[in-house]
């Protein structure tokens, strides 16, 4: 009888340990899946914003190439209901979703490796851009807030508060007026230089998040670095061009 009780106790204890391990494994599995899904959504939102950057720099470059074309495209986008009431809200959501997901993942990584952060020599194991994504992201988000206030809110005032008559020839002149201010040009250029550092790591990270980096890693890495340099440089060129062409 004593032997049976001892064996039963051992079995119950073993079963309890097994159950605890099972629960721990399930929690870890769910956390892993959750983390992977967050990274995938982070990568997809990054792709969305990269696509927007291509469209945005293409439109802005038209201001250098053709005043009439820039006015025509800007007027179309400014009064197209699909762009205004569907495209812009989606863009705003994409921006905030991307940054919120980035902050959440950064906090998760810091909690998961508290000791490693204390002893890890970051400069020896990763680039400056990868170690400071959250800093560059915060600065870019702050700049976007100013940029939206400067452009989007002024546009809302023009259309819905003052209710001025639509003028398709006003956009080029307004752009030139903004870039006549040297402080504005400096802030604009600094923001896009920082965006370049953000993209230097962010482009390849987005590829990795959606599973494209393994098969095309070398080509995508080269393209990502070219994109990180080329697109911000184009934005900087546009600002500098309009400033110096007015001196």
Predicted regions mapped to residue ranges:
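Polybasic, lysine-rich low-complexity intrinsically disordered segments
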Residues: 8, 16-17
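Membrane-embedded alpha-helical bundles that constitute the cytochrome b-like, heme-associated redox core
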Residues: 18-247
């Amino acid at each position: 009888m004593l032997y049976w009780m001892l064996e039963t106790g051992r079995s119950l204890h073993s079963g309890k340990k097994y159950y605890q391990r099972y629960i721990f494994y399930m929690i870890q599995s769910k956390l892993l899946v959750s983390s992977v899904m967050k990274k995938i959504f982070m990568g997809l939102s990054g792709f969305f914003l990269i696509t927007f950057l291509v469209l945005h720099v293409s439109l802005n470059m038209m201001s250098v190439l053709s005043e009439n074309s820039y006015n025509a495209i800007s007027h179309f986008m400014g009064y197209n209901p699909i762009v205004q009431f569907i495209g812009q809200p989606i863009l705003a959501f994409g921006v905030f979703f991307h940054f919120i997901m980035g902050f959440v993942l950064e906090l998760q990584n810091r909690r998961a490796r508290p000791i490693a952060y204390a002893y890890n020599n970051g400069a020896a194991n990763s680039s400056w851009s990868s170690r400071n994504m959250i800093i560059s992201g915060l600065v870019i988000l702050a700049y976007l807030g100013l940029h939206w206030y400067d452009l989007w809110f002024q546009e809302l005032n023009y259309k819905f508060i003052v209710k001025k008559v639509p003028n398709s020839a006003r956009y080029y002149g307004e752009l030139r007026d903004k870039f006549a201010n040297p402080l504005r040009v400096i802030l604009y250029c600094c923001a896009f230089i920082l965006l370049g550092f953000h993209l230097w790591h962010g482009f390849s990270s987005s590829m990795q998040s959606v599973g494209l980096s393994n098969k095309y890693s070398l080509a995508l890495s080269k393209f990502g670095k070219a994109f990180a340099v080329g697109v911000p440089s184009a934005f900087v060129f546009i600002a500098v061009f309009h400033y110096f062409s007015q001196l």
